[in-house]
Amino acid sequence: MFRKFVQQDPDGYPLTELGSTRREFLMRGACLAGAAALGGAYLPQAMAAGPLTLKATHGTGLCNCPFFLVKERNLAQGVTLDFVTTPSNADIAALFGAGVVDVSVVPYTNFMTLYDAGAPIKIVAGSGAQGCVIVAQPGITSAAQLRGKTIGTFQADTLEMLPYDYLKKAGMSFADVKVRYFGTSPELAQAFIAGNVDAMCHIEPYATQALKARPGSVQLSNGVDVYGANYSDCVLAVRSKLLHENRDAVKALIKAMMVAQHQEELDRASAVKDTVGKYFKTSYDATLDAASKQPAMIDQRSNQNFILQRAQNLKDLRYIKRLPGPEMFDWGPLNEVIKENSDLYGQLKLKSA
């Protein structure tokens, strides 16, 4: 459905092509806003009649680990996840915005571009915290030394926000550097390891992989120095149709994510073993090393203002036209899950309360 919609315009942007400019990115977003009117993949179904299958997209970083564990360990009662494979990072959000999938773990920045374009979607929980990392080639040890250099990242991503804010903190801007956009996480990591970019902002475990593979490379920022601890990266978002028609399914998924967070906190090695290779295209050792650097945090109600503040960056970069408000969040199902599962919630290490 989505591919057919995109290909109606011979000059449009097919799923396999990643736009390299903001103009192309925004044209893709406009296309998706129209596709959203076609409806979602979710079909109403009584959970008592059998497991409800939700089509989903996900990212490639450790912020997605609880989402992966929900699927691999069958943690959601009455709900199963059907992951839809995407050819590029941009298409992870694209399919969600177009209504091809019901739910997604997505960078909050990508969510805001879809929301601004009119997609009927809501943030209902968090997924991962921290884990955005700026790494540089040997000899580059400060923001000032990035002047005139090439930084690799992804469009309208949290991985574009960090270098934007990192440079701003140093009195610089994107005008002082060359920004190069990539299509997939492995592609960006390999470009850095091969020395084809001077620096990159990447997600864990790919940042750790690159630092290990490129002798002498330097971590310039892990985001904590810019934003503080436990800043948001990815969020759990759902189509409004699903939220309205099967709230219990959304709650079951949120609870399962909390169970996954607890399991990950108790045994990171086991969580990595169940997800590396299939989801993380890095070595077991690099992934385990990185696991604690981007922990799961499902209750991110405390990050609402942080997320909204980043919207100004997206507007300045012309990804969105209007600043969103708190209405793009619906914490109701999360609040109910917490109230109904106080023992589980009390065992979580990272949370808002």
Residue ranges: model-predicted function:
Residues M1-E24, C31, A36:
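N-terminal secretory signal peptides
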Residues A35, A46-M47:
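Cleavable N-terminal signal peptides
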Residues A49-A191, D198-E204, Q219-S221, A229-N230:
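Short, glycine-/small- and polar/acidic-enriched structural segments
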Residues T109-N110, P186-K278:
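Pocket-lining segment of extracytoplasmic ligand-binding domains
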